[in-house]
Design a protein with these regions (language model features):
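C-terminal motif of bacterial Sec signal peptides marking the signal peptidase cleavage site
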Residues: 30-32
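Bacterial N-terminal signal peptides that target proteins for export
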Residues: 5-21
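Short, solvent-exposed loop/turn elements at domain surfaces
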Residues: 89-92, 120
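Residues within mature, well-folded domains
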Residues: 34-85, 99-108, 112-328
Length: 328
């Protein structure tokens, strides 16, 4: 009777080992065909931020404790600052003695009178907030929350408003304090013209105001290098998805120059002016222009090459760790 070799365990083992060896050899041969460019992913600025994630800095922690009070702690007299006249869409407004209905405008203050349950068409009472407006008129906001939900909520957002207590807390913490500005774009105050003055210079905080719903804090500063001149920057608070311009993105508590002792003085002056030159390192360029929107890092015959891309067609090319070419 003829024996089937495929049933021989030794034969099966030999063929398995042989196929494994062929696969490994083929994989090694194929990997040698790659130049490095084909397998190099585009790294976004978000990837860079994740790599640099660490314990919160002093700047990240400085205003982190300032948060709106939960609704259960709201008392009569609580103030909200109007940021947009579209708030009239979400408010029920009464008329004054002359029969005029006033639309709240940006900068107006609404003062809470009551937070009380009111009947609805579904017979399920909801908490309605009653405010007095800047003209003494009565304004009502329907929260859509029953009393239990109202008391259990940690926060509530009234559209087109800013919590005035939060602005007061930031003002108490910042006014009169000497800081260093790291934000590049600012505006003249109170005119509001956009400017890009020098960064990493000392400033003194002179005032704090309510801003917009997206950028709720305006910090008014007097730069050391432009005394008697007021500038302003917008700032966010908290740790939500919209907190993209918090204190640590705008200010430094200490002189940033002390963190970079190896940077030459003439290069530091370029950085403060938002300029670059050939031969600067990636860190120096990042300090001057900010983080790129994306970069590609690939090996080449000349060494490691990095390409940084910014908005408006700006790009930087680094070779072996120094700036070799750029377009601004």
């Amino acid at each position: 009777m003829m024996r089937n070799l495929s049933d021989d365990p030794n034969s099966i083992m030999r063929r398995t080992l042989s196929m494994t060896a062929v696969c490994l050899a083929l994989a090694a041969a194929l990997s040698g065909c790659f130049t490095g460019v084909e397998s190099t992913p585009i790294i976004s600025s978000k990837d860079v931020q994740r790599q640099r994630a660490s314990a919160p800095s002093a700047e990240q922690s400085y205003l982190a404790d300032i948060r709106p009070a939960p609704p259960s702690q709201w008392k009569p007299g609580k103030r909200l600052i109007v940021t947009d006249s579209r708030i009239s869409i979400v408010l029920d407004a009464s008329t004054d003695a002359q029969g005029t209905r006033h639309t709240p405008t940006p900068g107006d203050t609404l003062r809470l009178v009551t937070a009380a349950p009111t009947p609805t068409l579904t017979e399920q009472p909801e908490i309605t907030l009653t405010f007095v407006g800047a003209h003494g008129d009565s304004l009502a906001y329907h929260t859509g929350l029953d009393e239990r939900a109202w008391k259990s909520r940690q926060s509530i957002e009234i559209p087109f408003t800013i919590d005035a207590d939060v602005i007061d807390s930031v003002a108490h913490r910042l006014i009169g304090k000497h800081l260093y500005i790291i934000a590049q774009r600012r505006m003249t105050w109170p005119e509001g013209a956009v400017i890009t003055p020098r960064r990493y210079v000392g400033v003194t905080v002179r005032d704090v105001r309510g801003g917009t719903a997206e950028l709720p804090v305006i910090v008014v500063i007097e730069p050391d290098d432009a005394p008697d001149t007021l500038q302003a920057v917008y700032m966010t608070l908290g740790d939500g998805a919209t907190a993209t311009r918090n204190f640590d993105k705008v200010f430094s508590l200490i002189n940033p120059r002390s963190r970079y002792p190896r940077i030459e003085d003439d290069v530091w002056q370029l950085i403060c002016d938002g300029k670059i030159r050939l031969g600067m390192t990636p860190d120096e360029c990042r300090l001057s222009l900010g983080a790129p929107t994306e970069y590609i890092k690939v090996p080449s015959t000349a060494g490691m090459v990095e390409r940084w891309t910014y908005p408006d067609g700006i790009f930087l090319i680094f070779e072996d760790g120094v700036l070799a070419r750029y377009r601004r």
